[in-house]
């Protein structure tokens, strides 16, 4: 195993640890594509964790400087400051793919702002956040998952990322509240007459369910729109993207089956993932 192989393996471990659903799906890509996904996922995870886990603004700055070095001089040797193994893997990807570096910087800017979290006044602000933390990831992955990236390809990948982030929010309402965060907008909370603190303490009510389903309908519509345009991605990537997205959309039904609880995190069981895999395998005849 070469040093570069070890770098990618390190990135893969990060992906498997933090996103079993993504790993389950994207590990089915051809080798070069899945390695690129591992590297990009690991970079994005380190960006997220720099503040959420480490509380280290200097580390986030180092990540940004390392990415800038790769963008400016992709073929030169660099003394990376953040995580050398991840950055070497990203540099290798950047030498072969047209990486949308600005999307990394947009993600970093969102993480900067997230240090001083305040509730969103409107849904527009919420959806802007979903773009910043997840739509950006879709943009960065676009050259990996498509043969000829176009404006439409970037748009579809961005919408998929935003949809998956909204699903994360719908899954983690209780956990986020425990961390003193409410992502639903004040505008919509007022409209549906919902107080998350009250729901957390006293239990789910019809007002909360209606609010939750309002946002779930948005995520489900975006999911359907992405599936309708799945052919913008490469033949190899289409079934993988559909598998990842369908596993994620299943999370919404898991929340419903758990009576919209705010006191436990739901997940999609392995047997359901396997069932989806076989369905999509039959549809595409190529996974």
From Swiss-Prot:
It comes from the Bacteria. Mg(2+) 2 binds at residues 168, 172. It catalyses: 2 (2E,6E)-farnesyl diphosphate = 15-cis-4,4'-diapophytoene + 2 diphosphate. The keyword Metal-binding applies. Pathway: Carotenoid biosynthesis; staphyloxanthin biosynthesis; staphyloxanthin from farnesyl diphosphate: step 1/5. One of its GO terms (molecular function) is metal ion binding. Its EC number is 2.5.1.96. One of its GO terms (biological process) is carotenoid biosynthetic process. It is an enzyme of class 2 (transferase). (2E,6E)-farnesyl diphosphate 1 binds at residues 18-21, 41, 45, 171, 248. Its cofactor is Mg(2+). It comes from Staphylococcus aureus. Gene3D superfamilies: Farnesyl Diphosphate Synthase (1.10.600.10). Involved in the biosynthesis of the yellow-orange carotenoid staphyloxanthin, which plays a role in the virulence via its protective function against oxidative stress. Catalyzes the head-to-head condensation of two molecules of farnesyl diphosphate (FPP) into the colorless C(30) carotenoid 4,4'-diapophytoene (dehydrosqualene). SUPFAM superfamilies: Terpenoid synthases. Belongs to the phytoene/squalene synthase family. CrtM subfamily. (2E,6E)-farnesyl diphosphate 2 binds at residues 45, 165. Keywords: Carotenoid biosynthesis, Magnesium, Metal-binding, Transferase, Virulence. This is 4,4'-diapophytoene synthase. Mg(2+) 1 binds at residues 48, 52.
């Amino acid at each position: 195993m070469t040093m570069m192989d070890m770098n990618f393996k390190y990135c893969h471990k990060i992906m498997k640890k933090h996103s079993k659903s993504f790993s389950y799906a994207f590990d089915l890509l051809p080798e070069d594509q899945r390695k690129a996904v591992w590297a990009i996922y690991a970079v994005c995870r380190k960006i997220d964790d720099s503040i959420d886990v480490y509380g280290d603004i200097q580390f986030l700055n180092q990540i940004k400087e390392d990415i800038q070095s790769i963008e400016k001089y992709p073929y030169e040797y660099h003394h990376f400051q953040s995580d050398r193994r991840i950055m070497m893997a990203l540099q290798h990807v950047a030498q072969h793919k047209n990486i949308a570096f600005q999307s990394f910087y947009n993600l970093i800017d969102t993480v900067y702002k997230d240090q001083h979290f305040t509730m969103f006044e409107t849904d527009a602000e919420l959806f802007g956040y979903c773009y910043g933390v997840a739509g950006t990831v879709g943009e960065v992955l676009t050259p990996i998952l498509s043969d000829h990236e176009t404006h439409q390809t970037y748009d579809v990948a961005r919408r998929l990322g935003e949809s998956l982030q909204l699903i994360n929010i719908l899954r983690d309402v209780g956990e986020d509240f425990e961390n003193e965060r409410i992502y639903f907008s004040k505008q919509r909370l007022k409209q549906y007459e919902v107080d998350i603190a009250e729901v957390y303490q006293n239990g789910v009510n019809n007002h909360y369910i209606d609010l939750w389903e309002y946002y779930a309908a948005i995520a489900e519509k975006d999911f359907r729109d992405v599936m309708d345009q799945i052919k913008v991605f490469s033949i190899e990537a289409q079934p993988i993207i559909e598998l990842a997205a369908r596993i994620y959309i299943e999370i919404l039904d898991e929340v419903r089956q758990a009576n919209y609880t705010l006191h436990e995190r739901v997940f999609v069981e392995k047997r359901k993932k396997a069932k989806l895999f076989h369905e999509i395998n039959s549809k595409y005849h190529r996974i």
